[in-house]
Amino acid sequence: MYNTYTIGELAKILGITPETIRYYERKGIIAPIHDEKTNYRYYTTWDLHMIIRARCYLGFGLSIDETSKILQKRTLEEIDDVLDNQEKIIEQNIIYNMNLLKKMRTKRALINNFEEKNLTLRTSPGIYRIDTQKCYTLDLSEQEKEELKQFTQYVPFIFSTALFPKEHIETENKDFYFGIGIEEQFASLFDIKETEYVHYYPPRTCLYMSFSSRSSQILTYEVLEPAFEYMKKNNLELDGDIFTQIVSMWKPEEEYFNWHNIWIPVR
């Protein structure tokens, strides 16, 4: 009734290997004619187009098992239900990847605009932030560890960040906090909310500067002295906690280095 073709002929037409065709058969996607005398399998154009259809579904992101199942559906409605669900998954992936691209461009802009100790007034990004340590010591409760572990799952959208509390600066307390942050524009991807340990810092007018730090030197708010001098000269007052964004880190030899962008709330 139908012309038949060998597995080699079919593989050549499709640009795939004979083993791939055998794999589709094992998954129940095609049912070639089996010659019991020779033990050879022969394929028709139905098999050709069934494989093409299967590869289309695989191209939409369905797994091989999901592809096998959809090809066994008996109604268009059943097929559409599967495709509707896959459409939602593709849409979610597109949204995620668009934000990933935006994050990459944001990061590159921070790197390209890095000017050490150059002072300007800018609006800070809104960020969510959680502490990892006080100064250089990890001292977290079990609940803090759990929330921190969850926060670290948001890579690559998160960044390391130092925090200098306003009250510490006013009382000349050199302790600071280090932690992890995420910009508000990306927090919605993960439905991040404020908690006892996750704190939100809204966008606000800040004195902006950049500086580099290194592991051989203890970090203190004293690195911000150029900013404090600028504030005195321009009648600006500190109006909140100071936080930094780590633009990048590197380790050329035995020492660690950070590049910080610093946001100093002023009024």
Could you say what each language-model-derived stretch is?
Residues 81, 98, 102-267:
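A solvent-exposed interaction/effector surface
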Residues 22, 35, 68, 163, ...:
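Short loop/turn and capping residues at structural boundaries
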Residues 1-60, 234-239:
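Basic helix-turn-helix/winged-helix DNA-binding cores
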Residues 42-44, 76, 250:
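Short Asp/Glu-rich motifs
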Residues 11-20, 25-32, 72-89, 147-162:
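An N-terminal domain-start capping segment
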Residues 33-37, 58-68, 256-267:
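Histidine- and aromatic-rich ligand-binding microenvironments
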